[in-house]
């Protein structure tokens, strides 16, 4: 009898717990965004110690991928898999049609990363504040991009966070992309891995050591909470493997984790919206 009453009491308490709402699983907190003057997201949840690793690429068809390509994707995927970390990938639509990238793109999806794009043809949207691509031309380019994403089984609700081509756009271009149903992000200001294409004869040239030093200086001075950290998944010519930032991805992940950072993707952002 005591056992029976105990069962009733326990069941009753559980029922009251659920009815009171205490047993409900907490809904994800709506993301907080830090935007630049153009209105593009540059950091996500700056109060949380997470980093958003993003990887972009384009395939230059005029030189069969000599200068721009997606050849870094497999080493990036292998490192992320080894470290148990997820990333967000934004190749241009042109990358999706190259035979050599079919399997890596499928891996991006199958291994749980976020996949979107970077326009189809890597359009230069603006220059010196002037819009260079009309809304109609942009819509045609994005329609081609969407065909490729959906060829891999994705729906727009899964890939609507997008990086503008060349990580550059003005307010008009942003509004045109938003009218097509997209939300925009760009790499956070500070890190300089996007200069990995430069060579020693260029004024903007930075060595890989300088790029890494800049990242750790930024972490120590400002912190990297919510940072969108861009690394090109490309093999630029006239570069040795040690000079390619993605070949230092494992070191970057290890150091960030040792300093208490976690990693998130734009899948997490969509889930919380």
What are these regions (language model features)?
Residues 1-11:
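Bacterial N-terminal signal peptides that target proteins for export
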Residues 19-21:
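C-terminal motif of bacterial Sec signal peptides marking the signal peptidase cleavage site
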Residues 24:
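Short, conserved catalytic or interaction motifs in soluble domains
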Residues 27-114, 121-127, 144-159, 252-255:
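Active-site beta->alpha N-cap acidic-glycine motif
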Residues 97-103, 122-230, 234-262, 268-271:
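Catalytic domains of cell-wall/extracellular-matrix polysaccharide-remodeling enzymes
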């Amino acid at each position: 009898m005591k056992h029976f009453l105990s069962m009733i009491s326990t069941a009753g308490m559980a029922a009251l717990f659920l009815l009171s709402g205490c047993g409900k699983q907490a809904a994800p907190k709506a993301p907080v965004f830090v935007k630049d003057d153009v209105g593009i997201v540059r950091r996500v949840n700056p109060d949380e110690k997470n980093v958003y690793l993003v990887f972009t690429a384009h395939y230059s068809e005029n030189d069969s991928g000599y200068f721009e390509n997606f050849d870094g994707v497999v080493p990036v995927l292998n490192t992320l898999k080894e470290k148990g970390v997820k990333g967000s990938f934004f190749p241009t639509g042109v990358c999706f049609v190259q035979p050599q990238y079919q399997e890596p793109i499928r891996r991006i999806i199958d291994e749980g990363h976020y996949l979107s794009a970077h326009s189809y043809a890597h359009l230069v949207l603006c220059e010196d504040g002037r819009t260079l691509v009309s809304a109609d031309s942009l819509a045609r380019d994005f329609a081609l991009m969407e065909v490729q994403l959906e060829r891999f089984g994705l729906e727009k609700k899964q890939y609507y966070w997008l990086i503008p081509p060349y990580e550059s756009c003005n307010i008009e271009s942003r509004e045109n992309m938003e009218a097509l149903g997209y939300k925009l992000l760009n790499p956070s200001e500070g890190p300089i891995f996007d200069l990995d294409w430069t060579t020693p004869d260029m004024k903007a040239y930075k060595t890989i050591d300088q790029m890494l030093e800049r990242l750790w200086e930024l972490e120590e001075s400002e912190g990297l909470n919510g940072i969108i950290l861009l690394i090109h998944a490309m093999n630029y010519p006239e570069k040795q493997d040690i000079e390619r930032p993605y070949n230092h991805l494992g070191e970057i992940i290890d150091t960030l984790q040792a300093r208490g950072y976690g990693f998130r993707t734009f899948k997490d952002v969509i889930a919380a919206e």
